């Protein structure tokens, strides 16, 4: 059973004494949400969505532009589409934008909440394959929450099955 705490890179998420320590921990962990439509602000362009975490980290404008282009390429989207709004993309493309946003600050851990459940079956494999490629090329660790064990088996090295908060398998 979980005790309400967690450790990331041997650092407790509960023992932080300062805001700067908590911000540093958050920088090293990012989240990709289940519903790409709900996770992206429809008032922002893709550029603004991807630039926001970089601005929050104090990155300079020319470096932000380069990083946004790099992120678009990394997730398999056309860099010249950065001035579009989320509603101009398909569900799979929106999920790729969410993945790019999570990768913007070079996290060590990405938490994926049902990353493909809201996508068409034909698009799911492409996103799972992208996640696999990114994990290998960027040295990422994933914590994936999903109900589809086939997706979990394909995308994971280790699996824990939970039932009412307890690991049962």
Please tell me what each predicted stretch does.
Residues 109-111:
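Walker B motif beta-strand of ABC-family P-loop ATPases
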Residues 85-89, 93:
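Conserved ABC ATPase signature
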Residues 35, 44-55:
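Q-loop/switch helix immediately C-terminal to the Walker
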Residues 55, 62-80:
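Conserved ABC ATPase "signature" region
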Residues 119, 123-169:
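P-loop NTP-binding/switch modules centered on Walker-like glycine-rich loops
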Residues 7-30, 56:
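ABC ATPase NBD coupling module
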Residues 106:
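Conserved catalytic motifs of ABC-family nucleotide-binding domains
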